[in-house]
């Protein structure tokens, strides 16, 4: 009986385990959904920002890149920009997708919520992000830390 239960569990659990790591099906319109936890400790700039946040990057099958970012900004730092850069953990890299830039006004709100559609720079596609997310990071810049206040590697 135990052997029968084990075989049954292995037969039906395996497809579930395999399916959980697969990007959304093409019929759903989404190529991949990526996340990054944003914190100063991840920055290469020496940032001592107390802000923390989360970014979600959704890449649609047509290549559209949508983003949603929430930042808890306890000390009301002035945030001026946010981007996706290409570089591994611990390395600063070039901007490949602008997220939060002018003409969006700088903000020092305690709870910052940004969302929209982002246009990647030439040479970068949403498919690149999906294929190797850990090669990219999101970071947000403040007036005190113009090189980057909070950062998180995409996963």
Predicted regions and their residues:
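Metal-centered catalytic cores of metalloenzymes
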Residues: 4, 15, 20-82, 86-155
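Hydrophobic alpha-helical transmembrane segments of integral membrane proteins
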Residues: 11-12
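Bacterial N-terminal signal peptides that target proteins for export
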Residues: 1-8
């Amino acid at each position: 009986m135990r052997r029968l239960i084990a075989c049954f569990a292995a037969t039906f659990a395996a497809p579930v385990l395999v399916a959980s790591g697969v990007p959304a099906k093409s019929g759903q319109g989404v190529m991949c959904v990526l996340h990054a936890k944003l914190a100063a400790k991840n920055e290469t700039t020496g940032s001592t920002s107390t802000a923390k946040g989360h970014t979600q990057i959704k890449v649609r099958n047509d290549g559209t890149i949508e983003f949603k970012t929430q930042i808890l900004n306890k000390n009301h730092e002035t945030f001026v920009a946010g981007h996706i850069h290409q570089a591994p953990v611990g390395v600063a890299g070039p901007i490949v997708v602008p997220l939060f830039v002018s003409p969006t006004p700088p903000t020092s709100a305690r709870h910052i919520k940004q969302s929209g559609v982002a246009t990647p720079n030439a040479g970068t596609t949403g498919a690149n992000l999906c294929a190797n997310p850990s090669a990219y990071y999101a970071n947000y810049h403040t007036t005190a830390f113009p090189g980057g206040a909070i950062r998180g590697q995409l996963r």
